[in-house]
Amino acid sequence: MNIALIAHDNKKKMMINFTTAYELILLNHQLYATGTTGKRIMEETNLKVTRFQSGPLGGDQQIGAEIANNRMDVVIFLRDSLTAQPHEPDIQALIRLCDVHMIPVATNIATAEILIRALERGDLDWRERVKERG
């Protein structure tokens, strides 16, 4: 499955801890991330990550395009809800696209752990059938 990993600056360490803890599960999937998040994940784990632009430079929109074209299956977006983000409209658009296209999305670590366990159990295999139908 194709998994997008995004983390605001104050959540990047949490994303590194998450990807380290679940590295064995994530190794079986194609990973995509915004620029700095992807770089940090690759520096600290053995995971291969396809990187888009940094979020404020359009990375969120690039991932949104993948969602709109049915090429993303799961989005894990560790948001810093306590800090104003200059690209907040892009963030809202990304979450809206997940809702419209029925893409499971986690915006905090608790939900991310639920999604990763569901992925491990095969609970999200229905996404493959959705992609086949196009």
Swiss-Prot record:
EC number: 4.2.3.3
Entry-linked Pfam families: MGS
Binding site for substrate: 8, 12, 34-37, 54-55, 87
Enzyme class label: lyase
One term of GO molecular function: methylglyoxal synthase activity
Residues annotated as the enzyme's active site: 60
Segments forming domain MGS-like: 1-134
InterPro entries associated with the record: Methylgl_synth (IPR004363), Methylglyoxal_synth_AS (IPR018148), MGS-like_dom (IPR011607), MGS-like_dom_sf (IPR036914)
Catalysed reaction equations from the record: dihydroxyacetone phosphate = methylglyoxal + phosphate
Any single GO BP term: methylglyoxal biosynthetic process
Record has Iron-sulfur as a keyword: no
Top-level taxon of origin: Bacteria
GO cellular component: cytosol
Matches recorded under SUPFAM superfamilies: Methylglyoxal synthase-like
Keyword entries, A-Z: Lyase
Record carries keyword DNA repair: no
Role of this protein: Catalyzes the formation of methylglyoxal from dihydroxyacetone phosphate.
Family recorded in the similarity comment: Belongs to the methylglyoxal synthase family.
PANTHER family linked: METHYLGLYOXAL SYNTHASE (PTHR30492:SF0)
Listed name of the protein: Methylglyoxal synthase
